[in-house]
Amino acid sequence: MAPWAEAEHSALNPLRAVWLTLTAAFLLTLLLQLLPPGLLPGCAIFQDLIRYGKTKCGEPSRPAACRAFDVPKRYFSHFYIISVLWNGFLLWCLTQSLFLGAPFPSWLHGLLRILGAAQFQGGELALSAFLVLVFLWLHSLRRLFECLYVSVFSNVMIHVVQYCFGLVYYVLVGLTVLSQVPMDGRNAYITGKNLLMQARWFHILGMMMFIWSSAHQYKCHVILGNLRKNKAGVVIHCNHRIPFGDWFEYVSSPNYLAELMIYVSMAVTFGFHNLTWWLVVTNVFFNQALSAFLSHQFYKSKFVSYPKHRKAFLPFLF
């Protein structure tokens, strides 16, 4: 790789700057939550911004000004509707370019350039980005199915800022994946005779990890949904119960751990070396760790008999 290309590939482009900023924000928030109770800032607005669902309803007194910005947590499905549509469109554009030689729409190519997508991406394999975009779309489709048919949402809330962030998040993730495609002008650039010639061992490993992580996340969501249903599958209440089974035996929020592993599987599919995607993974790590920590606190405060050996997010560690 030419020195100028290597420098461009390693530069802090706008896309990396966004993910680095989000990572720093979630890390700082997590560190603040880990402070001893007496040192933790008591700002109600701050706590309202970072909590959602059961961890929000556990707050003793929420000002009316905070409640004015509540959005039902069941609106989580909107995130995945947007993701399925948007990332499905991006996948269609990439498929057209890879297999039919059709150029990206000019507005999309311009947007990718603004975000920092570089020509040729330093030898990045087009197959890697294609597989990751497929994984992202399948993940979003499964999560949409779970929101509609598996999960049982109570009347708990999320902040409107969290809702807006969720809507933008999967749009940004999809653009991040597409920006890793090696480009020749407005067309995807394929090194070698065809796309399948780019197949590597890490593509197989990444696919296996994705399937494994997705299966565990689905199982954990089924366990959570069944806590509110009878044996016939009918919802009988919306109370919280202690979940057992699968990864719940090790951590309080295995669905968050599985989410992290899904993104790690995509990093593996990129061949381990994609710095931009590792910034995405790091953001997911601190984001999910924060949510898991708050959920762990909720469970321990609500249930006296909560298993002492369970960690919040990482088995045996945290």
UniProtKB/Swiss-Prot annotation:
PROSITE patterns: S5A_REDUCTASE
Consequence recorded when altering E146K: In CDG1Q; uncertain significance
GO CC term, one of those recorded: endoplasmic reticulum membrane
Cytoplasmic topological segments: 1-11, 102-117, 179-194, 282-318
Claim: Endoplasmic reticulum is one of the keywords in the record: yes
Keyword Lyase attached: no
Effect seen on changing H296A: Loss of function
Regions that span the bilayer: 12-34, 81-101, 118-138, 158-178, 195-215, 261-281
UniProt topology in membrane: Multi-pass membrane protein
Alphabetically ordered keywords of this record: Cataract, Congenital disorder of glycosylation, Disease variant, Endoplasmic reticulum, Intellectual disability, Lipid metabolism, Membrane, NADP, Oxidoreductase, Transmembrane, Transmembrane helix
Gene3D superfamilies: 1.20.120.1630
UniProt note on tissues of expression: Expressed in preadipocytes (at protein level). Overexpressed in hormone-refractory prostate cancers (HRPC). Almost no or little expression in normal adult organs.
Principal location class: endoplasmic reticulum
Lumenal side, ranges: 35-80, 139-157, 216-260
Reactions it catalyzes: a di-trans,poly-cis-dolichal + NADP(+) = a di-trans,poly-cis-polyprenal + NADPH + H(+); a 3-oxo-5alpha-steroid + NADP(+) = a 3-oxo-Delta(4)-steroid + NADPH + H(+); androst-4-ene-3,17-dione + NADPH + H(+) = 5alpha-androstan-3,17-dione + NADP(+); 17beta-hydroxy-5alpha-androstan-3-one + NADP(+) = testosterone + NADPH + H(+)
Compartments where found: Endoplasmic reticulum membrane
Enzyme Commission (EC) number: 1.3.1.94, 1.3.1.22
Pathway(s) served: Protein modification; protein glycosylation
Pfam families in alphabetical order: Steroid_dh (PF02544)
Superkingdom as given in the UniProt entry: Eukaryota
One of the GO BP terms on file: dolichol biosynthetic process
GO molecular function: 3-oxo-5-alpha-steroid 4-dehydrogenase (NADP+) activity; 3-oxo-5-alpha-steroid 4-dehydrogenase activity; oxidoreductase activity, acting on the CH-CH group of donors, NAD or NADP as acceptor; polyprenal reductase activity; polyprenol reductase activity
Endpoints of the signal sequence: none
Reported function: Plays a key role in early steps of protein N-linked glycosylation by being involved in the conversion of polyprenol into dolichol. Acts as a polyprenal reductase that mediates the reduction of polyprenal into dolichal in a NADP-dependent mechanism. Dolichols are required for the synthesis of dolichol-linked monosaccharides and the oligosaccharide precursor used for N-glycosylation. Also able to convert testosterone (T) into 5-alpha-dihydrotestosterone (DHT).
Disorder: Congenital disorder of glycosylation 1Q: A form of congenital disorder of glycosylation, a multisystem disorder caused by a defect in glycoprotein biosynthesis and characterized by under-glycosylated serum glycoproteins. Congenital disorders of glycosylation result in a wide variety of clinical features, such as defects in the nervous system development, psychomotor retardation, dysmorphic features, hypotonia, coagulation disorders, and immunodeficiency.
Record's protein name: Polyprenal reductase
Species of the source: Homo sapiens (Human)
